[in-house]
């Protein structure tokens, strides 16, 4: 409060007086309401010359929370067979054998409970912050390896198939993360943005952690064969908070975050006569040896009552803490200065575009949220939409129809499979115009994460190879993955494994694939056209020497086939049978280069290539595997690989894959290709679910300038537009557009009469199979928001005179059927008049976004209950409302292909 001025009062006194008005004053968060203005007394011309005012700044709570804390110290040992030293598996076939990792951390509780930060958070209710992570590396020059630090929001609270630990190596490296190379990095840093769907973290009642942070090994740790101190790598993990909002004081304290601090009470027992004699002897000795001290004690005791012999004291005794039920105060942590960023390509998912831009040229053309304009009229409307950046091309394309129903024409469900148009769904809401606002401040990134170019530009590891001193010159690298050093150039997935289960009479073989993000997108379409990009990185030491040749072979890929698979024919690709003198190639010298990024523009005698890929590939198929790819890259040594005995006799080759300038054509039925998401069973013996049908990243590029484009090509965007005009007639630029199209989730949903049935009985199954765009795309995002639309097509033959009706109700998502709940938002139709029941479920929710397929957070958004007075069969189709979207891009799941059963 301001000091009242009274120049006549020069003394430090104030006499009582009466004021005429009430006084209301606020000091910090406390408001005083006094009947009279209080008298105030202050020291006149106060001064303070204490050196404490100048020896240091006054540290705030926010500054304290921003101090880095040493969270963990890790030692990685080369050659160890422990699980925390194993590299990522290419596939995960059951949940008993998930992906191995070096270390994991649960955030933010790990940071909040370290370094005394919990005490600073005491007596506050809400916290919202980012978490910064810095790993400091200490490795000698004789050891090589590459790690991947990645995080996954709510990883332990989603369906198992959506966990980072139950997906492929390509899926893991598609999560937001950063590489750590033992020889190139002495430290890395990343920012994990606030990842909860709630507005703030509840410090009092909430122990809900929302991020799992993992440290994976991409390649084996390479060192000399003998285990010694030179085969170890030391890692120090620091974490701190940033972008902090700490609000709403409270008297409550969460004891799991803030430790108890108690007072130790010690009682001195009654002194006996023997004790008195001991004291008397001590006083005699003191009088003789230290007269001044003796006189002081006697003077102090002379005024006391001699009969008092019981003494009780309260002290803070560290010596006796072990015998008392009290928690000692944590010692003050050392004030570690906040480290500066050493690698600019770091950061949260909101910085993903920046990181990928260094790798995937053209990512800067991805639209930001809110980049919309009015439609432009032109001869070809979809071209005008693209040029004018209208909202439709980003997926805001299908408003509901509010016009009066035409009395003379009844075409229910018209155009339901189109991405753009007018929808006739009846909203189960209060307002017929129910619709959420724009996406600003919903997800951490301002970039449109559903743009096709953004998703396909997300790199993932497809190969981890090994080059040994014994490998032949001019022979393709064959160690490592099934395709070895042969890399098909194209968007489709070309790698798979066969999962086999047996019983007494039969053997079942199922294809399991490991798609990268661009391959995952390609699965939803029949044809593709793009510039394919491959980053080939060598994990080595300075003592490894040799040269690799990487050449592009256009057209057909030499392959061999088995009854279950397709693989390259390496015997046809040596230097004699396949000389590369006239091919586009790059020679990588291990002495000078660590990596190379190769861009291969689209080149073919066709405007588009097929998207089939490895799906169903075997010796019995009747299609050409090469129709899915424009050619192949081949990695083979052109010199011997050499090294001294003090280092490993091999190096690792890591191949990342992504796509630029992407065009995908003809949405295909999601049951006609490898779009069933693989749900890893619990054990290797368990059978898997089959369908009876035909069917963040922030890549730390260490050498941004080391990029080569094979052969000159015209402007890719111009060539793509020409191909679309000649062979497609439309363009899909955003995955959100697919969410506006209705796709079937059940061909024959049987509804018993006079029974309420929750739509989740159907959608929970569809979401696991990934059989419509909404469920399939949900696996590469962690959050969603917005309403859903459903169309029920009655297929039961009904008599004209039969009074049959179907009715839908708005309910909470995890609501139990209740026959009395009939008075909320609902819709009713009579199949004899209108065989299509069209409804929309709005997004009624406490939060601006929700986790996808959460197994613990239930009942937050609305759902649908369906009822019919007559038993009916329905074809059910689903789509997103015009405000529905996914956000927070993560890695891809594994997909499942053809299943074949044979008799033993």
UniProtKB/Swiss-Prot annotation:
Residues 39-53 have a biased composition (Polar residues). GO terms for cellular component: host cell cytoplasm; viral capsid. Specific enzymatic cleavages in vivo yield mature proteins. The keyword Magnesium does not apply. GO terms for molecular function: structural molecule activity. Keywords: Capsid protein, Host cytoplasm, Virion. Gene3D superfamilies: 2.60.120.20. Residues 1-27, 35-54, 320-348 are annotated as: Disordered. Residues 329-343 have a biased composition (Basic and acidic residues). It holds the Pfam family Rhv. Structural polyprotein: precursor of all the viral capsid proteins. Belongs to the picornaviruses polyprotein family. This is Structural polyprotein. It comes from Acute bee paralysis virus (strain Rothamsted) (ABPV).
